[in-house]
Design a protein with these regions (language model features):
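Extended substrate-binding grooves/exosites of carbohydrate-active enzymes
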Residues: 1-166
C-alpha cells in the first residue's frame, strides 16, 4: 500500500496503457480548471496528452515536466513535430538516493520499486552518483542529433531470451 502502490501503478503508465489514461475524458475534466488558469501546461508522465492539449488549448504552450527516460525517442518526435511543445524534463538527469531500485530492470517478474537489499539508489538517472554517464544518456544524445557515432549497449547474457519489466 501507500507510496509503493502508487509508484508501482505509475511504472505501468507508459505506452498504450499510459496513453489511454492520459487521454481519458475523466482526466480531461479533472485538469480543465487548472489548465484554464495557466499560460503553460506542464504534464508529468502524460506524454500521450501532449498533442491533445493543443487541440483543447490551441494558444497555450505544453511542456513535459517529468517523463520517463526510456520514452525519449517517442517524446522527442512529439516535441519536434508540434510547435506548441516547448520541451521536456526527464526524471531524473542525475541518479539519487531514495526510491531505491525504481530504474532497475527486473527479469524475474519483479515490479519496479521492489528493490532488493542492498539497493540504495534509484538507478534511473542519465548520470550516476559520481557523474559517470549511463547508457540512456547516449540514447538521448543520439535522439537530440548530437551524436553521430554509434553507441553499443550490451544485454547481459544471463538475461538472453528473458523479458524485462520495462
Amino acid at each position: 500500500g501507500g507510496s509503493n502502490a502508487l509508484n508501482s501503478f505509475m511504472s505501468l503508465m507508459s505506452g498504450e496503457k499510459g496513453d489511454y489514461f492520459a487521454t481519458h475524458p475523466l482526466l480531461t475534466e479533472a485538469l480543465s480548471g487548472c489548465e484554464d488558469s495557466c499560460d503553460v501546461i506542464g504534464l508529468n508522465y502524460l506524454t500521450g496528452r501532449h498533442v491533445l492539449e493543443h487541440e483543447l488549448h490551441p494558444h497555450k504552450a505544453v511542456l513535459g515536466t517529468e517523463t520517463y527516460p526510456a520514452d525519449i525517442v517517442r517524446l522527442w518526435r512529439i516535441v519536434e513535430e508540434n510547435p506548441h511543445m516547448i520541451g521536456d524534463f526527464t526524471w531524473a538527469g542525475y541518479d539519487y538516493l531514495g526510491e531505491a531500485g525504481c530504474g532497475i530492470f527486473h527479469y524475474d517478474g519483479g515490479a519496479n520499486f521492489s528493490s532488493i537489499y542492498p539497493e540504495r539508489t534509484a538507478y534511473i538517472g542519465d548520470l550516476d552518483l559520481l557523474g559517470n554517464r549511463r547508457p540512456i544518456s547516449y540514447l538521448r544524445e543520439i535522439v537530440y542529433g548530437l551524436r553521430k557515432a554509434p553507441y553499443l549497449a550490451v544485454l547481459r547474457m544471463e538475461h538472453n531470451g528473458q523479458t524485462s519489466s520495462k
